[in-house]
Amino acid sequence: MSKLLLKNVDYLVTFNDKDEILRNYDILVEGNKITKIGKDIQTDETGDTEIIDATGKVVLPGFVNTHHHLYQTMFRGIDEVQEMPLFPWLEGLYEFWKYLNEETVYYGSMVGFSELLKTGCTTTMDHHYVFPNTSKSTLIDEQFRASEEIGIRFHATRGSMSRGKEQGGLPPDSVVQSEEEILLDSERLIDKFHDSEDYAMKRVALAPCSPFSVTKSLMKSSAELARKKGVMLHTHLAETMDEEEFCISVYGMRPVELMEDTGWIGPDVWFAHGIYFNDDELKRLKGSGIAHCPSSNMK
């Protein structure tokens, strides 16, 4: 088992219940676990160990990224979609995303993981929901390959889109899948990659993309499968007024009511964005998680 010993950490920021900041401490890491924190940990206790002198350094827990789209790192700076509201922005970019393949997803993940690690983020999720008809269904497998190679803790969410333009949704039909195909691949990924143990480096959650790109049936089926398998649920919610208008027009209810109706409220659910909730909805969401994305929503 690999071991790492950080010696003489000037400031160890614990983020524990007391928010303690410890001075001049050592940290011993064995494998993927911090096994000891203390003063003057001796090398003869640890055997063959890599030692780093942390004098003058600050050490703190790695940041955790709770919402991301790694493949989008490959599509930055496209002039046609700059400064657009969400719906036309998506419609413009779908014309590029419909050509996604395994290579693009792998390298997009490597770029994104590198940027995250460089800025102190050691755990990240990703919400990948674009599966073009021309690509294989193993795009998320490529993300796990990249995460293992670079060494980041990765929680993949198996995103999905089942409501294309022909069914009144936003995405083109070339990037949507059938409900059966989505659920079969979701179960395959859970069985192949999900590790429920403490300190796991790989986990899987289920993440239908949004109320305007999936069917009500898929939301319910995904929730049932996730709870059967013991994994979490994630989706975009209340990100724009266009989404609210879509939900009222198609379902006759606001986004939060739709989530309640499909079994998507609870401690095993976290939503992305969530900026158009009223006071009553905030009370009903108590216990569910929200990933706030200010750099996106303040554009």
Language model segments and positions:
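N-terminal metal-binding scaffold of metallo-dependent hydrolase/deaminase domains
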Residues: 1-46, 58
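Divalent metal-coordination and catalytic microenvironments
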Residues: 9, 27, 32, 56, ...
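Alpha-helical scaffold segments that flank or form the walls of functional sites
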Residues: 78-127, 131-153, 184-198
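Metal-coordinating catalytic core of metallo-dependent amide/deamination hydrolases
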Residues: 133-274
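Active-site-adjacent C-terminal substructures of enzyme catalytic domains
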Residues: 264-299
